Amino acid sequence: MPPIMLNRFTLRNFYLNLSLCKYVSTFKILFPKKRKLFQTSSNLSLCYSDIRRTSLSSKSASLELTTSSSSVLSPSSKYVFSFNSLKNGVFSKSSAELRF
């Protein structure tokens, strides 16, 4: 599956809470340049996953999620990503809705 581009982020440090209502086999999210690199490999069948920030960085940071499920994404599947950013002790929320 091709990467999914997300470019509506303004804060450098943030935590990602991923909420899924269906099984996902594999997909990748690419963040804008100069962002931190997030990576995880887990079973998302519980419909929730916490992704911790790593110390790695790259020109094109990415987040890749892999599950043990072999199911195929439906074209009508809907996934909502909720981003909780922490800057100067203040939380800021943003989200991205993905449809396949």
Curated annotation (Swiss-Prot):
Partially overlaps CDC7. This is Putative uncharacterized protein YDL016C. It comes from Saccharomyces cerevisiae (strain ATCC 204508 / S288c).
